[in-house]
Swiss-Prot record:
It is an enzyme of class 2 (transferase). Belongs to the class-V pyridoxal-phosphate-dependent aminotransferase family. PhnW subfamily. The lineage of its organism: Bacteria, Pseudomonadati, Pseudomonadota, Betaproteobacteria, Burkholderiales. It catalyses: (2-aminoethyl)phosphonate + pyruvate = phosphonoacetaldehyde + L-alanine. Pfam families: Aminotran_5. The keyword Manganese does not apply. Its cofactor is pyridoxal 5'-phosphate. HAMAP family: PhnW_aminotrans_5 (MF_01376). This is 2-aminoethylphosphonate--pyruvate transaminase 2. The gene is phnW2. Involved in phosphonate degradation. Homodimer. It comes from Polaromonas sp. (strain JS666 / ATCC BAA-500). InterPro entries: Aminotrans_V_dom (IPR000192), NH2EtPonate_pyrv_transaminase (IPR012703), PyrdxlP-dep_Trfase (IPR015424), PyrdxlP-dep_Trfase_major (IPR015421), PyrdxlP-dep_Trfase_small (IPR015422), SP_NH2Trfase/AEP_transaminase (IPR024169). One of its GO terms (molecular function) is 2-aminoethylphosphonate-pyruvate transaminase activity.
């Protein structure tokens, strides 16, 4: 196919032509026009969470995981104790990065097909007063589970614990209001539900704790406190910024606002999700999660029971038809994932279902029903 393939993944995503065209101009990293773009992006990001009074936002080069790691290193003191609420692969990544930077880390495990429990968190905090910070993955895209941010935030606030939220796959699609939800840090990135391109993360940090973060990070480039102070003083990034990514994000945010902001973005993703679920059910596919805990971000489907099914061939066939799927991330059952986000609508989701039907036909599979 001549046109770009549609990415049905949790990021990078399909972007609009306007976003792509924004990257055709070169920018100087110290140029006043570029610094103005950075400032505008930061203001717009704070607008989305209604956070101007309570938080600052610090952009950082790299993937979203860079910013998660930077947030933990900047916020958690060296003698701090982090509790990770674990119900999936991206929770386990948070555990690993916390351990690698030498912070004490405890894991509170949950089933990968269920949201984390605020009640279990409360019990753990009562049992271990040494815990200083809690890490929550808002939308655990390993399976697609939506975790209860408000309830977890309320428990952390009641116990005086710092909350670090990985909102990578929820920010700008699901409502997050800093006036209602108390968190010390919330992390997201350019290439997710804002529909920019990958290459920049950003961390919202509560103003009340900011000064206490000075000198905590053992990294030069990933010290969010130093990054913030330098930006406030100079309007510039400390080190070479991803100029094209920042400008593309500014354009993507403009389109986000034109669409109607977070409520409109969520409504489109929900339509995408409904179209996908209905179409896949016709083919015999069954989603892994109960709809009550499924975020309209990415959907995990059971693999067909048919012995002729093989994901690599299935993926390649769908890709030939213009759609890029995503492998499963679960440990116990064979699955694959289909994203509902990006610059796409129900029409593209219908086309994706048609492509998946063609992939099954290529493999000689008449029904995609799972084994159980």
């Amino acid at each position: 196919m001549d046109r770009d393939k549609i990415l049905l993944t949790p990021g990078p995503l399909t972007t609009t032509l306007r976003t792509k065209l924004a990257m055709l101009k070169d920018w100087g990293s110290w140029d006043t026009d570029f610094n103005a773009v950075t400032a505008s992006v930061r203001r717009s990001l704070l607008d989305i969470i209604h956070g101007h009074d309570s938080h600052v936002v610090v952009p950082l080069q790299g993937s979203g995981t860079f910013s998660v790691e930077a947030a933990v290193a900047t916020l958690v003191p060296h003698d701090g104790h982090v509790l990770v609420l674990d119900n999936g692969a991206y929770c386990k990544r948070a555990v690993r990065l916390t351990q690698l930077m030498g912070r004490r880390c405890t894991v509170l495990p949950f089933d990968e097909a269920a949201p984390v429990s605020a009640a279990a968190l409360a019990d753990q905090l009562k049992a271990d007063a040494s815990i200083s910070h809690v890490i929550l993955i808002h939308c655990e895209t390993g399976a697609g589970v939506l975790n209860p941010l408000q309830e977890v935030a309320d428990v952390c606030a009641a116990h005086g614990k710092g909350l670090i939220v990985d909102a990578m796959s929820s920010f700008a699609a699901l409502e997050i209001d800093a006036r209602k939800v108390r968190f010390d840090a919330l992390v997201a990135a350019s290439g997710k539900c804002l529909e920019g391109v990958p290459g920049m993360g950003f961390v919202f940090i509560r103003k009340a704790i900011l000064e206490g973060c000075a000198g905590r990070s053992q990294s030069l480039a990933m010290d969010l406190y130093d990054q913030y102070i330098y930006m406030e003083k100079t309007t510039q990034w400390r080190f070479t910024p991803p100029t094209h990514v920042v400008v593309a994000l500014a354009e993507a945010i403009a389109q986000f606002e034109e669409e109607g902001g977070q409520p409109a973005r969520l409504a489109r993703y929900q339509r995408n999700y409904s179209t996908l679920i209905t179409g896949m059910a016709r083919l015999g596919f069954r989603p892994f999660l109960d709809p009550a805990i499924q975020a309209p971000i990415i959907v995990t489907f059971h693999a067909p029971a048919d012995s002729r099914y093989e994901f690599k061939r299935f993926y390649a066939s769908a890709r030939e038809r213009g759609f890029v799927l995503y492998p499963g991330k679960l440990t116990q059952v064979e699955t694959f994932r289909v994203g509902c986000i990006g610059a796409i609508g129900p029409r593209e989701m219908e086309q994706a279902v048609h492509a998946i039907a063609g992939a099954l036909q290529d493999m000689g599979i008449s029904s995609a029903a799972p084994a159980h």
